[in-house]
Amino acid sequence: MSIFTKIKKSLKSENLVNYNKFIKNLEFDEKNSTSTHLIIKAPNIFIANFVKRKYLNKISELYEKETGIKPKIDIVTKEISHRPLTIEEIIEPTTPSVLIPEYTFESFIVGPSNQFAYTAAKSVAENPGKNYNPLFIYGGVGLGKTHLLQAIGNYLKSSLNVLYVTSEQFMNEFTENIRMKTPERFHEKYRNCDVLLIDDVQFFAGKERTQEEFFHTFNELYNQKKQICLTADRPPKKLYDLVDRLRSRFEAGLIVDIQPPELETKIEIIRKKCELNGIYLPEEIIEYIATKLDSNIREIEGMITKINAMSKILGISEITLDFAKQALKEHIKDKKEVITLEDIIKLIAKEFNIKPSEIVSKSRNKNIVAARRCAIYLAREFTKESTPIIAKYFGLRDHSAVSHAIKSFNKKLKEDSEFRIKIEELKNKIQIKKSE
């Protein structure tokens, strides 16, 4: 096995998705390389740039570990490794449609938490542009949104012109074409596809020119009855920094969510991942992983890989529960719960005996106003959201209204000792949730 093959194998064990997207098709240029100067060929400029940014140091470290030599590394494109890039070559590969073959409907584990999203995605794939257009899938990180989006693409790619990109890729390519004064090239690519799949549209937030361009792209495709599928980490109504007319387009189709998988679904996911990767884990270890680890499927995959890799490195032929606990000890110990605005709203609604929807309403009822101010105060203290985002979430005019609410709340804290004790109890509950 060559050194470069070993390096690729090591990178594959760390992140299978990125390996399939960016590392798998890299080639080592033996003819032009030396022991101190490595030339690696990438299929296109996009992959070359990604590998330079994300993997150059790692490849260098792995090579030095194998040989004892710290190399100089050049990442070039296969077809243009010995000549300058033309404008066309720079622009065209900037946003490749990378569909991962493994992401199919057959490999997607269905459970109560994702049944509706799965059924909707399958229906769209079977009747593109007819049933649900656009299809908007939202949910937390690592729950399967990208898998379903790509499953649609893989189902249709043999018969239709399918274009899959992330919102960041869309934005980067749009910006590059504007800079190069070639907007027609961008329009030709994005407005002539049959199926447009865009991942993580929440990253369009605040990018006004990109939103404007996507609005026109959306309309052009929609009017031609072309299928549009989108994913985000939240529903359209909570994409606060999107222009209203774009948000309304998203809301006009079918909106489905994916919830964190319940225990039984997590167990099935772990079994499937082990089967696909040729890894055997006893049932008690599978159940341990399912109960102890986050519902983030990517994290679960990473832990399976870690247990398997550690067992091979240490020469352990039979993986026991004690070994699995030891392998995952640091990860489980360091896990922290992320507190969201929704968590704050639910907690305050329960404490004040009102509905969550009343907290974000315009009601001036004294009890609801007090609950709202309390929620705003705790949101500012315990979530990562900015003041403008908090303002929009609670339906306030702007960030100054948040400051006013917090000021009023602090005044009550100083004046009312009983109220202060109650708030400290709420803070303790949130701290406990964070450390779980």
From Swiss-Prot:
Annotated residues for binding of ATP: 142, 144-146
SUPFAM superfamilies: P-loop containing nucleoside triphosphate hydrolases, TrpR-like
Domain of life of the native organism: Bacteria
Residue span of region Domain I, interacts with DnaA modulators: 1-69
Gene3D superfamilies according to UniProt: 1.10.1750.10, 1.10.8.60, 3.30.300.180, P-loop containing nucleotide triphosphate hydrolases
Annotated spans, Domain IV, binds dsDNA: 312-436
Keyword terms of this UniProt record: ATP-binding, Cytoplasm, DNA replication, DNA-binding, Lipid-binding, Nucleotide-binding
Nucleotide-binding is among the record's keywords: yes
Pfam families: Bac_DnaA, Bac_DnaA_C, DnaA_N
Family the UniProt entry places it in: Belongs to the DnaA family.
Subunit structure: Oligomerizes as a right-handed, spiral filament on DNA at oriC.
Function: Plays an essential role in the initiation and regulation of chromosomal replication. ATP-DnaA binds to the origin of replication (oriC) to initiate formation of the DNA replication initiation complex once per cell cycle. Binds the DnaA box (a 9 base pair repeat at the origin) and separates the double-stranded (ds)DNA. Forms a right-handed helical filament on oriC DNA; dsDNA binds to the exterior of the filament while single-stranded (ss)DNA is stabiized in the filament's interior.
UniProt note: domains: Domain I is involved in oligomerization and binding regulators, domain II is flexibile and of varying length in different bacteria, domain III forms the AAA+ region, while domain IV binds dsDNA.
Name of the molecule in the record: Chromosomal replication initiator protein DnaA
Name of the gene encoding the protein in the UniProt record: dnaA
